[in-house]
């Protein structure tokens, strides 16, 4: 979605010309869930004057009830009309930043927190941090009650066409809706697993790209239901097939120059690119809980399903955590392959950026690239060349996060503490459950 700039007068004009009936004021909580306050268009002036309030104590991870009043400050550049609402009175969306009653940004707002880390980046002389995400999702059939089943919509494979790929019509409608909302779609295809899909859209600056991810998820789920399908961004909904990732392709800029590109070096990369990569590798264990926030996330990060399990980097090899795609010039970027679509994009990107800046500020040295298939190396071979494992459970990821000051700085005290507390509860709840697998394994034997 290309960057646009709107004024209050523009918004008033759009609302009147398009006969908008409702305004949806959208924000994202710490767990990555989209929240919204919907108001009639008669409240537009109040919205434009940053006077819309909501109860922050009702949002998980925000505040206690005694300090609950919050204000929504809309980002006017995020104005869009949902195409599917035309028949019932048009609904427009504005993404908002959350502010406290004293007029300062709320420390628990992931979007505002990302802006804080971007300011730190600017203080180091960089002007832009761009993100190109690659979100994947599964489509499951709905039952007669509208509940998701475990029946996939097709048995297609990577880049398959209809009739094997029965989700093609749904995917095409999703693309059309996204384009109507201003997205620049680059590709749309079936992924490796049956029922799995990927739609790639053009990179954008950090905040806009994260806004786009949240909008993308909403559109995918909405249009899927119109096709009697349930779209899920759960990282590993099925055993024995590839899970869904959301690779982050990131690049730093100084003005119009890509700070990662140097045509005079062997790999075409600058010292800044190597230092940034070194910082991401150094802090990878610490940010894994943020980039892979569910118990289920770690069912994806296992050998054999094209997801990274090991902390290393390479130019072409897809088995390490970081890959440097072959494009150079303005397209020079690094691809962080561990991120999954359940991640809060604002928090995941803040953690990755802070990690990279840690590498730049401390002039960290990147290890040698690993060009062999790490999945085929045994533990002794990996340890001999200094390759660490990513955390294998949410519990070990949270432990690594608690020990990492860079990630604490990336998220700020409020988000950091609330996230760890919420995810620790989730882990404790999971570990005390008795699963169907356990009953199948042990009920008769013992």
Curated annotation (Swiss-Prot):
Residues 110-446 form the GS catalytic domain. Mg(2+) 2 binds at residues 136, 191, 198. Inhibited by glutamine. Gene3D superfamilies: Glutamine synthetase, N-terminal domain, Glutamine synthetase/guanido kinase, catalytic domain. The keyword Nucleotide-binding applies. Pfam families: Gln-synt_C, Gln-synt_N. It catalyses: L-glutamate + NH4(+) + ATP = L-glutamine + ADP + phosphate + H(+). Residues 18-103 form the GS beta-grasp domain. InterPro entries: Gln_synt_N (IPR008147), Gln_synt_N_sf (IPR036651), Gln_synth/guanido_kin_cat_dom (IPR014746), Gln_synth_cat_dom (IPR008146), Gln_synth_gly_rich_site (IPR027303), Gln_synth_I (IPR004809), Gln_synth_N_conserv_site (IPR027302). Binds 2 Mg(2+) ions per subunit. Its cofactor is Mg(2+). ATP binds at residues 186, 251, 318, 323. It is found in: Cytoplasm. The keyword Transcription regulation does not apply. L-glutamate binds at residues 242-243, 300, 306, 318, 337. Its EC number is 6.3.1.2. GO terms for biological process: glutamine biosynthetic process. Keywords: ATP-binding, Cytoplasm, Ligase, Magnesium, Metal-binding, Nucleotide-binding. Oligomer of 12 subunits arranged in the form of two hexagons. In its feedback-inhibited form, interacts with TnrA in order to block its DNA-binding activity. PANTHER family: GAMMA-GLUTAMYLPUTRESCINE SYNTHETASE (PTHR43785), TYPE-1 GLUTAMINE SYNTHETASE 2 (PTHR43785:SF12). This is Glutamine synthetase. It comes from Staphylococcus aureus (strain MRSA252).
């Amino acid at each position: 979605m290309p960057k646009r700039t709107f004024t209050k007068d523009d918004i008033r004009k759009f609302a009147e010309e398009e006969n908008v009936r409702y305004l949806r004021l959208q924000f994202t909580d710490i767990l990555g869930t989209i929240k919204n306050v919907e108001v009639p268009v008669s409240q537009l002036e109040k919205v434009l004057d940053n006077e819309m309030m909501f109860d922050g104590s009702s949002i998980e991870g925000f505040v206690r009830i005694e300090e609950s009043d919050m204000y929504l400050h809309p980002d006017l550049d995020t104005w869009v009309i949902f195409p599917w609402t035309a028949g019932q009175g048009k609904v427009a969306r504005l993404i908002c930043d959350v502010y406290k009653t004293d007029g300062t940004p709320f420390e628990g707002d992931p979007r505002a927190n990302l802006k804080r880390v971007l300011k730190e980046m600017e203080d180091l002389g960089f002007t832009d941090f761009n993100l190109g995400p690659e979100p994947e999702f599964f489509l499951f059939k709905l039952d007669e009650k509208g509940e998701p089943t475990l029946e996939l919509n097709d048995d297609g494979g990577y880049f398959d066409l209809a009739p094997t790929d029965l989700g093609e019509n749904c995917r095409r409608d999703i693309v059309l809706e996204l384009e109507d909302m201003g997205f620049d779609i680059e590709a749309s295809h079936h992924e490796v697993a049956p029922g799995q899909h990927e739609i790639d859209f053009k990179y954008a600056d950090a905040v806009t790209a994260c806004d786009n991810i949240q909008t993308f998820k909403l559109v995918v789920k909405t249009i899927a239901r119109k096709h009697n399908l349930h779209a899920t961004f759960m990282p590993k909904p099925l055993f024995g097939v590839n899970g869904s990732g959301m690779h982050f392709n990131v690049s730093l800029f100084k003005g119009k120059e890509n700070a990662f590109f140097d045509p005079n070096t062997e790999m075409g990369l600058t010292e800044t690119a190597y230092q940034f990569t070194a910082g991401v590798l150094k802090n990878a264990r610490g940010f894994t809980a943020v980039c892979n926030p569910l118990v289920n996330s770690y069912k994806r990060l296992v050998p054999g399903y094209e997801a990274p399990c090991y902390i290393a980097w390479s130019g072409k090899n897809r088995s390490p955590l970081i890959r440097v795609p072959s494009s150079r010039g303005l397209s020079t970027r690094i691809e962080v392959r561990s991120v999954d679509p359940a991640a809060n994009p604002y928090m995941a990107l803040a953690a990755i950026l802070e990690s990279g800046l840690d590498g730049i500020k401390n002039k960290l040295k990147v290890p040698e690239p690993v060009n062999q298939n790490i999945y085929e190396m045994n533990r002794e071979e990996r340890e001999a060349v200094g390759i660490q494992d990513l955390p294998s459970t949410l519990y070990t990821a949270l432990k690594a996060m608690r020990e990492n000051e860079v990630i604490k700085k990336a998220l700020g005290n409020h988000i950091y503490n609330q996230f760890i507390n919420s995810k620790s509860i989730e882990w404790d709840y999971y570990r005390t459950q008795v699963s169907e697998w356990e009953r199948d394994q042990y009920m008769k034997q013992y």
